Curated annotation (Swiss-Prot):
The gene is hldE. NCBIfam families: cyt_tran_rel, rfaE_dom_I, rfaE_dom_II. Residues 356-490 are annotated as: Cytidylyltransferase. Homodimer. ATP binds at N205, R206, K207, E208. It catalyses: D-glycero-beta-D-manno-heptose 7-phosphate + ATP = D-glycero-beta-D-manno-heptose 1,7-bisphosphate + ADP + H(+); D-glycero-beta-D-manno-heptose 1-phosphate + ATP + H(+) = ADP-D-glycero-beta-D-manno-heptose + diphosphate. In the N-terminal section; belongs to the carbohydrate kinase PfkB family. In the C-terminal section; belongs to the cytidylyltransferase family. One of its GO terms (cellular component) is cytosol. The active site is at D275. It comes from Geobacter sulfurreducens (strain ATCC 51573 / DSM 12127 / PCA). Keywords: ATP-binding, Carbohydrate metabolism, Kinase, Multifunctional enzyme, Nucleotide-binding, Nucleotidyltransferase, Transferase. This is Bifunctional protein HldE. Pathway: Nucleotide-sugar biosynthesis; ADP-L-glycero-beta-D-manno-heptose biosynthesis; ADP-L-glycero-beta-D-manno-heptose from D-glycero-beta-D-manno-heptose 7-phosphate: step 1/4; Nucleotide-sugar biosynthesis; ADP-L-glycero-beta-D-manno-heptose biosynthesis; ADP-L-glycero-beta-D-manno-heptose from D-glycero-beta-D-manno-heptose 7-phosphate: step 3/4.
């Protein structure tokens, strides 16, 4: 899949309305140091230094979709307890529609507590209900689907065998979706895949595929037999088997098989990687992407996810950046404004502080680099607005720039301190600032606050302006004069 198509998918993610149905849970992480053995028993003692609560299970799928820029609704059942309240508040805070979540006082909201030291899990403690939700709760979810379901572009089913996804509810959801040609993407659990019959695509891992097919996967031949059996058992259009360090394999009706190698650079934790695969594949299908390209995109996202500890989300920037890593593209950071606006919106949804600066950057020198490094220190990512060739000619005369905009953008994108480069053709970056709405606007020390274009815009929504001093004696003009003095007569 070409990068421009991936960028277009993310740029239009806001048009995708996704419904996530499944088992919700809280993931609690206790981080600490394990440097002692207990005198009471031969076990490690963990001195807890930090605690964190994240949304897990189907909730992590929803969080991933939000991070990708989609509109998201969730249908599920939680207990009438503190953990259920935490989940509902967390979703609402992210703009996730919780109308389809049923509160049942007789149930316990799932909470998994993981104890970690040196980024490794030591023990996990579970508190949860595993009983089926019952006919009344099934009917309430189906009623929600009948009332609101026509607005969804895709339905993602996240099954953790905690009782929400009963055979009755699954049959109702799949029948509803098939009637309306809405794709249903399922992350399955258990060995009975007949309950998912009629879904569009399933995404089991290798161990799950073995259990469901009854075939031990030892080589490509046994893998293909397992895939074909599951396609038939569940009457699927497609099947994606994730294979850890071996990537994933896509099976389509008619015997077509596509093997996709992994792109994970380093694996810290596989927790939640399946949620990321489900979210990205579902988003891709909703956005009109085919199964093969959707699986490749999900594979890239999974490679990013396993490089993080615990349940986490993956941003469009990380996915596009990984595509650039795979393809060896040095200009993966260079975006047009439409694409960049979608990416930045998703980054902000994850709480990232965006810094913006702009300039010509003709003949890059150490003063530029130090300035950009300082600008990057004010936030989590730096966007550079780069004056186009035409813009520079209007500002500095027909002899400038010395280096064209494509080369300048490529050179600047190679700097670690720069996350994105966007070329603009106007005389000022005001349109960029109004569109991207950075938290911090940075300009050189030769400006006064009153002279900074976009200052009023940034300050109007609580942002700020930072002025950074230049390195004395370092400028493009000085370099040009030095070259002319040394070589002008030759």
């Amino acid at each position: 899949m070409e990068r421009k198509n991936v960028e277009s998918l993310f740029a239009h993610a806001g048009a995708i309305n996704a419904l996530v149905i499944g088992d919700l849970m809280l993931d609690q992480y206790l981080w600490g140091k394990a440097e002692r053995i207990s005198p009471e028993a031969p076990v490690q003692v963990v001195d807890v230094t930090r605690e964190e609560i994240r949304i897990g299970g189907a909730g992590n799928v929803a969080n991933n979709l939000v991070a990708l820029g989609c509109r998201v609704s969730v249908a599920s059942v939680v207990g009438g307890d503190e953990n259920g309240t935490i989940l509902l508040h967390a979703f609402s805070g992210k703009g996730i529609d919780v109308t389809g979540i049923v509160e049942d006082p007789s149930r316990t909201t799932s909470r998994k507590t993981r104890v970690l030291a040196s980024n490794q899990q030591i023990v996990r403690i579970d508190r949860e209900s595993r009983d089926e939700i019952g006919p009344d709760n099934e009917r309430r979810i189906v009623d929600y689907l009948n009332a609101h379901g026509d607005r969804f572009n895709v339905i993602l089913v996240s099954d953790y065998l905690k009782g929400v996804l009963t055979p009755t509810l699954l049959a109702e959801v799949i029948a509803f979706a098939r009637k309306r040609e809405i794709p249903v993407v399922v992350d399955p659990k258990g060995s009975d895949y007949a309950k998912y019959r009629g879904a569009t695509v399933l995404t089991p891992n290798r161990k799950e595929a073995e259990a469901a097919s009854g075939i031990a996967i030892r080589d490509d031949e046994s893998l293909c037999r397992a895939g074909e059996r599951l396609l038939e058992t569940a009457d699927l259009t497609a099947l994606v088997i994730t294979r850890s360090e071996e990537g994933m394999s896509l099976f389509l009706r008619g015997g077509q098989v596509v093997h996709i190698p992994t792109y994970a650079r380093e694996v810290f934790d596989v927790t939640g990687a399946g949620d990321t695969v489900l979210a990205v594949l579902g988003m891709a299908l909703a956005g009109g992407v085919g199964f093969a390209d959707g699986a490749r995109l999900a594979n890239v996202a999974a490679g990013v996810a396993v490089g993080k500890v615990g349940t986490s989300t993956v941003s469009p920037a990380e996915i596009v950046g990984s595509l650039g890593f795979q393809h060896g593209e040095g200009d993966a950071k260079v975006k047009n404004l439409d694409v960049l606006a979608g990416i930045i919106a998703a980054e902000k949804a994850q709480g990232k502080r965006v810094v913006f600066t702009n300039g010509c950057f003709d003949l890059l020198h150490v003063g530029h680099v130090k300035y950009l490094q300082k600008a990057r220190s004010f936030g989590d990512l730096l966007v550079l607005g780069l004056n186009s060739d035409a813009s520079i000619r209007r500002l500095k005369g027909e002899k400038r720039p010395l280096i064209g905009q494509e080369e300048r953008a490529h050179i600047l994108a190679a700097l670690d301190c720069i996350d994105y480069v966007v070329v603009f053709d106007e005389d000022t970056p005001l349109n960029l600032i109004e569109t991207l709405r950075p938290a911090v606007l940075v300009k050189g020390g030769d400006y006064t606050l009153d002279g900074v274009v976009g200052r009023e815009v940034v300050e109007s929504y609580g942002g700020r302006v930072e002025l950074v001093a230049f390195v004395d004696g370092r400028s493009t003009t000085n370099i040009i004069e030095k070259i002319l003095k040394a070589y002008g007569e030759e």
